């Protein structure tokens, strides 16, 4: 039973990370301010038209 709990948690974490990477990849930006909301508490920068969260 412990194996299944760990397995399900792993799937959930990977799904969240994967979805977040897609959201960041799709976010087009012109200035650093465009990335501020996307990156929440971290510093967002605009690199080659895409947001990068530090």
Swiss-Prot record:
Signal peptide feature range: 1-27
Q: What is this protein called?
A: Potassium channel toxin alpha-KTx 28.1
Give the UniProt subcellular location, in the record's own words. Secreted
Q: What is the effect of changing residue 50 to A?
A: Shows a decrease of activity on Kv7.1/KCNQ1
UniProt KW Iron keyword: no
Q: Which UniProt keywords apply?
A: Disulfide bond, Ion channel impairing toxin, Neurotoxin, Potassium channel impairing toxin, Secreted, Signal, Toxin, Voltage-gated potassium channel impairing toxin
Miscellaneous note, as given in the UniProt record, is:
Negative results: does not show activity on ion channels KCa1.1/KCNMA1, KCa2.3/KCNN3 and TRPV1.
- Which Cys-Cys disulphide bridges does the record give? 29-46, 35-51, 39-53
> What function does the entry list?
Selectively inhibits Kv7.1/KCNQ1 channel (Kd=11.69 uM) and inhibits Kv1.1/KCNA1, Kv1.2/KCNA2, Kv1.3/KCNA3 with a very low potency.
What's the effect of swapping residue 41 to A? Shows a weak decrease of activity on Kv7.1/KCNQ1
Q: Which GO terms describe its molecular function?
A: potassium channel regulator activity; toxin activity
One GO location term (cellular component): extracellular region
Name where it mostly resides: secreted
Family affiliation: Belongs to the short scorpion toxin superfamily. Potassium channel inhibitor family. Alpha-KTx 28 subfamily.
């Amino acid at each position: 039973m412990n194996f299944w709990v760990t397995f399900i948690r792993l799937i959930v974490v990977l799904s969240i990370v994967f979805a977040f990477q897609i959201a960041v990849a799709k976010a087009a930006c012109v200035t650093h301010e465009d990335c501020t909301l996307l990156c929440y508490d971290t510093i967002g920068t605009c690199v080659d038209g895409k947001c990068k969260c530090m």
